[in-house]
Structure formats: structure tokens, C-alpha cells
Swiss-Prot record:
Belongs to the GFRP family. This is GTP cyclohydrolase 1 feedback regulatory protein. It comes from the Eukaryota. It is found in: Nucleus; Nucleus membrane; Cytoplasm, Cytosol. Homopentamer. Forms a complex with GCH1 where a GCH1 homodecamer is sandwiched by two GFRP homopentamers. Interacts with GCH1.
Length: 84
């Protein structure tokens, strides 16, 4: 899976950071220390870490991921990363 989306809400200085969905690479999620959660009312799971996005981005860079783009949507910040 060469593409990855991560996001955080409201404040980017603190976590949690959403790092994956049900289809994400389990080994990568374990490396990030992510836990699988399902929010009340959702019929899908997401992986979260308590780290702020900067820490997550540093970990992903060490694994060969590079940021392709970043945007803000309302109070949510989203990064798209790619690994060659």
C-alpha cells in the first residue's frame, strides 16, 4: 500500500492522529503503535495513535513515506503520503 492518509482535528500540536482504516497494513499500524477503534454510530474502524501529527510524520518518513499534499477541511487537517 504505497499511499497513506493521516488526519487530526482542531489542534495539530496534540493527538490523537488518525493513521489508517480497516484496509491498512497491520504491520505499519503496529509500528506506529496504532489502536483500532470504531466511533459510536460508524460502521467502520479506524486506526488512531495518541501522538501529534508531527511525530507520526517523522515515523513515516523513517519508513520511506513522503508527503504529497496537505489540506484543511473545516477543523480537520489531512496529509496524503506516498512510499516509492
Amino acid at each position: 500500500m504505497p499511499y497513506l492518509l493521516i488526519s487530526t482535528q482542531i489542534r495539530m500540536e496534540v493527538g490523537p492522529t488518525m493513521v489508517g482504516d480497516e484496509q491498512s497494513d497491520p504491520e505499519l499500524m503496529q509500528h506506529l503503535g496504532a489502536s483500532k477503534r470504531r466511533a459510536l454510530g460508524n460502521n467502520f474502524y479506524e486506526y488512531y495513535v495518541d501522538d501529534p501529527p508531527r511525530i507520526v510524520l517523522d515515523k513515516l518518513e523513517r519508513r520511506g513515506f513522503r508527503v504529497l499534499s496537505m489540506t484543511g477541511v473545516g477543523q480537520t487537517l489531512v496529509w496524503c503520503l506516498h512510499k516509492e
